A protein has these predicted regions:
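Loop/turn elements at helix/coil->beta-strand transitions in domains of secreted/extracellular proteins
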Residues: 59-63, 87-92, 118-120, 137, ...
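Cofactor-binding loop segments of dinucleotide-utilizing enzymes, especially the Rossmann-like FAD-
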Residues: 67-69, 94-96, 145
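N-terminal targeting signals for export/organelle localization
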Residues: 1-45, 173
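The canonical Cys-X-X-Cys-His
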Residues: 72-76, 140
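Short pre-active-site segment immediately N-terminal to redox-active cysteine/selenocysteine motifs
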Residues: 61-63, 68-71
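A short beta-strand-turn-helix
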Residues: 41-63
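Thiol/disulfide oxidoreductase modules built on the thioredoxin-like
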Residues: 116-118, 124-168
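Structural microenvironment flanking redox-active thiols in thiol-disulfide oxidoreductases
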Residues: 76-114, 124-131
């Protein structure tokens, strides 16, 4: 077999590989250019103060939606960490349970566990959780100042430094 023939047999492989690389690059560019997903509109009651909480009231600054449930004991360490990172008025605690829950009791249980005051809204929001397809707990959604979802994370998360980095990226978005 001469060299010319051998080189031609690799050509389809090279073309396929180059095509794959270009396809992946195209997907990356499309994803990077995609419009951010807006956090849905909501108007719900803070179970601690009975005041209305809306998405519009959170606009203008970045914020975090923390989804959990009263029975989720493995969620406690995540709330502990995120509470230390996120400024006082920038974190909303949403309850995903369908059945009505005692938000005051939940807040008190969390304060006892954390051994500090939690001055955050505790909001019964199973419909919002369903709309956002929140199935795992805890679930965090980082929302930019314009109301767009910048990132999300499901499951136990206690690395406050990593949370602070994601928070800073959200604030800068």
């Amino acid at each position: 077999m001469n060299r010319k023939t051998k080189g031609n047999t690799n050509l389809p492989l090279i073309v396929a590989l180059a095509g794959s690389v270009l396809a992946l690059l195209g997907l990356f560019i499309i994803d990077a250019m995609a419009e951010p997903e807006p956090f849905p509109e909501f108007e719900l009651e803070d179970g601690l103060t009975s005041k209305s909480v809306t998405r519009d009231a959170m606009m203008g600054e970045a914020w975090v939606a923390y989804f959990s449930a009263t029975w989720c004991t493995h969620c406690h360490p995540t709330l502990d960490s995120i509470d230390l990172v996120i400024p006082d008025d920038r974190l909303l605690v949403f309850n995903t349970e369908v059945a009505d829950s005692d938000m005051v009791g939940w807040n008190e249980d969390m304060e006892d566990y954390l051994e500090r005051s939690l001055d955050r809204p505790f909001i019964h929001a199973p419909g919002l959780a369903t709309e956002l397809e929140v199935f795992g707990r805890p679930y965090l959604i980082f929302v930019d100042a314009e109301g767009n979802i910048q990132s999300d994370r499901e499951g136990l998360w206690t690395d406050a430094n990593e949370m602070a980095k994601v928070w800073d990226e959200t604030v800068s978005a």
